[in-house]
Amino acid sequence: MSDWRLTENVLDQNIPETKPRESKTRLEEIQRLALFQEELDIIEELDDPVDVWYRCIEWLLETRFLGMETVNKMLDDAIQYLERCRFALNDVRHLLIQLAKIKQSYETPDELQQAAKQFYQLASKGIGLELALFYEEYGSLLIRMQRWKEASEVFHAAVSREARPLVRLLRNAAEFSRAYDLHNAHPSIHDAPYSSPFPPPRIVLGSKPVSSSTLPSKPKSFQVFSDASSSRDSQNASDLPQAKSLESEANTPNLPLLYDKSSGKRVEYSAFNFLALYENGEERSMEECRAQRYLSSIQPNTAASFPKVVPKNEISVHHDSSSSNVSPIYKNPVAEQSDTPTRSLPKNYAYVAKSTSPELKVFDTVMPVALSPKPAQKPPSPTIHTKAALADILDIFNQPLRSESLEKSSKSPISAQSSYLGTPLKNDENSSNSGATSLTGRSQEEHLDFIPSLTPSKNYPSKIYSPNKNLDFSHTASKAETYKNSNELENVKREQPFSELLPSTLQEETATGTTSTTFANAKRRPEDSNISPTNPKKLHTLPRSPQYSTVDSNSVLSPAMPKGYMFVNENQSMKHESSVSNPVATIPHENGKHDFGQLSPIEHKPFFPKNDDELPGPSGYLTMPYEEAMASLSNLPTLINPLDQSLRDLLFQVLRPSLLRDKDYHEHETSFALVEHIESFVSKIKPKAGGPGRRRSSNRHSLDGPEFHLFYPPNTNLSVISKLGQGAFAPVYLVKSKIETENGDVSQGGAENNESKLFALKIETPPSCFEFYLTRQAMTRLKGLRETNSILPVHQLHMFHDTSHLLMDYRPQGSILDLVNSMHNSTFSSSGMDEILVVFFSIEFLRIIEALHTHKIIHGDLKADNALLRLETVADSEWSPIYSPEGLYGWSFKGIYLIDFGRGIDLSLFEEKVKFIADWDTDLQDCIEMREGRPWTYQIDYHGLAAIIYTMLFGQYIETRIEVINGQRRQVLTQRMKRYWNQDLWHRLFDLLLNPTLHVSEENLPMTEELSKIRIEMEEWLVNHSTGGSGLKGLLKSIEKRKI
């Protein structure tokens, strides 16, 4: 009889054979075993301990120099541990470890019998009973032992239990069934001894055994008891039982039986809340519960605290726990006049207000009104005219109008605040004179204080920065009065208001204009949706990284303008009055659908004056003495929120004197009212085929098209061409301009000649000066260093009451994120850039971050879309293919631009002991200190840099996990490095950036020396590998030609 085995040897597929690797040494295997032992020491803290044992056993079976004693010991330890874990009973990795132990007994017949016993023990322990692998290997072993009946029972049990995977199990069971039918006629199958392959089921008390194996094959007959054949006379009388008197037992009184006499009526059932009987762990009688409920009906202040039972189809009656705060008009006059207890209402009754006077419509008297309960029905179908659908339609038509509901709510004695909070407020004279109360219960005086809404961590002090309430920011003194004591300014640049230049009708309309939304504490909000991938088939395109939004960009509304004032002659040129520096804009005529080839320019004055009392934050120029601001800044606590608006207002007062000395900083005593007009203009411009997005190069096609002209005093003419992108805080527009000073010279950072040059204009709402300040500070502190080439210059800042306008250089090559997405779209690959490119850009990032941190500047918002490509044109003869770390031979013209310093921090303004804490929603793009609510300083930039390098390497946003290594919590990457990468260098770099405080103490940050060492290693590697393959020069040249 031929031997039969499974066609699919699942065990051999899952358990690797012992194939020693020649490249290993005994020392390497011992070191690897020690690493596994470290993981096993902390296995109780891991989420998946089975994985550690499985990887360890799998590796041990491949070792060459470690003896079988070590392998067997680890197998026994693994089995002993996993058998105690209930979650590992049906884990396939646990079963594979058990099979690896059993496989050692697959040689001789005696060992096969021992292996069958081990399978029997696994079944008794419930290991692998839900896995098809267990039954397949068990049945294969029994067939090798010629135990076909037991094998058939094993496969039947597997199919009945629907072991997984079921499809493979059914296929193997069908194959076994065909082989069993062929051997069924052989007499040796029927003569072979039978023993159950599974242990008998446990018998529960009161249940009959089901398994036939527990019953004896031949039950014995009952034995009849008989006395021994001996003489009755020889028996001792004392051995016989004594006779008892039946008469004494009959006279014994029986025990009374307790039962309820039947009344002859139908059995009644009552419902009761038995939880009320055992309230607070004490048992109470039903009479006590009834009495307490009776007392609660006549004494509301002494109402019982146990839950109330609401019978079916009955509307519950709500009782207030206290009536001390209720106005007398809400009291029940019926209950006050009568001392008799209120009678309980029958079912289907509820309290309904009955009006006794025309002014009081609710809560006057309480009268019971019968309600007919509506049966619960399913939602009606919108296509079938059922009664329920008609009832819903009638309810819609019968509901009160919005104006009527508002009028009724105003007449109601319950105020809007009380209805919102759920309980009526006390309506007395004191409350009416104390000012309007907001929904949070704060008066108007309290809202004048700048109090941050930070919720500190429980492990850190709760004293977060909150300025002194005695500081007065409400006055709007002139600049001369503000700084007359400190002698800070001699000549203050301040444009004259143009309210007198506007028509009277326009002044009346702008007087009622809406103010911009105040800048609340920063909360994270995703960016605009127009940055999504343009091609739906290219699924690997990364979206823009999340931004931190604080206000709605649509909150600034422009007042209406008189039509008679806006239209002028088409050929009329812009004229400026000599007495005033008047900002003027020229926009296309928006009269329905018109052709952009025939535009009618409209000249008007877009900036409207506002009342300073209505202006939020620094945009209103709320000033305070310079000495007082510096004193408040020096008295800050050690833990502050860097984005708290009150702190930023204080910093603005400190920085304002130095900003006013800058000739490129301009403050306007007006509001900008053209944001909506600009948006309307750019929305009508049709982009090129390929879709919208933040593609800077795709906007060059509209240079010869229509323009939206703007004029900023004193002498800046801008022409809006198109929209570059939409951030969470501000839109960015492509503009062209010719910037000249009063003497006719080009302003700082401007064009080298009088021809038009392209710029980027960022209009931020609410206004902020910190991006302009930090960018200028970085350029000043790094002056003369090579790192200044990596900072995008800013040229002018115009501060209005509602917006700030930052003019900066325009770079059409795109950002690092655009480059990653472009490579995804061109190669349809999920990976990132070439490693040599990642090393080059990482060196540029490390160099600029080291320089900024050395000069106490934190960028605060490092991400892939805040770094622009800087690939300037260099002659091929002047550009060496070998990389130069010193920037020689044309390499100084290649690198990156850092942008968006708006969330940056100038540490020189704070004490050295000051640390920061995040008060916004965080994710994996933030450092672990921010996610865990711990203080941080430079860690935010280190994590941001790690996220950028991760995106360049893998083409994804960074994902990390926490591992305990050598007793220390470390952040590690979830992705594995490719085998041909320089893994050692990348692992050390990511470990340094993700775990900086494990390498340097928090007091010794920043760790510029450690980063400098790794940067030098990367530069040496890049010098040796810059000419391999396509070469670094060839890759950069292809990026320059690529349309990002």
From Swiss-Prot:
Give the reactions, separated by semicolons, that this protein catalyses: L-seryl-[protein] + ATP = O-phospho-L-seryl-[protein] + ADP + H(+); L-threonyl-[protein] + ATP = O-phospho-L-threonyl-[protein] + ADP + H(+)
* CDD domains referenced in this protein's UniProt entry, alphabetically: STKc_Bub1_BubR1
Q: Where is the composition biased (Polar residues)?
A: 223-239, 430-442, 544-555
Which InterPro entries would you find in this protein's record? Answer: Bub1/Mad3 (IPR015661), Kinase-like_dom_sf (IPR011009), Mad3/Bub1_I (IPR013212), Prot_kinase_dom (IPR000719)
Q: Which residues does the UniProt record annotate as the domain BUB1 N-terminal?
A: 36-204
Q: Where does ATP bind?
A: A728, F729, A730, K762, D809, D865, N866, D900
UniProt xrefs under Gene3D superfamilies: 1.25.40.430, Transferase(Phosphotransferase) domain 1
Q: Region Disordered: which residues?
A: 209-259, 317-343, 404-446, 484-555, 685-705
What does the UniProt record tell us about how this protein is modified after translation?
Autophosphorylated.
Q: Under what name is this protein listed?
A: Spindle assembly checkpoint serine/threonine-protein kinase bub1
Q: What is the lineage of its organism?
A: Eukaryota, Fungi, Dikarya, Ascomycota, Taphrinomycotina
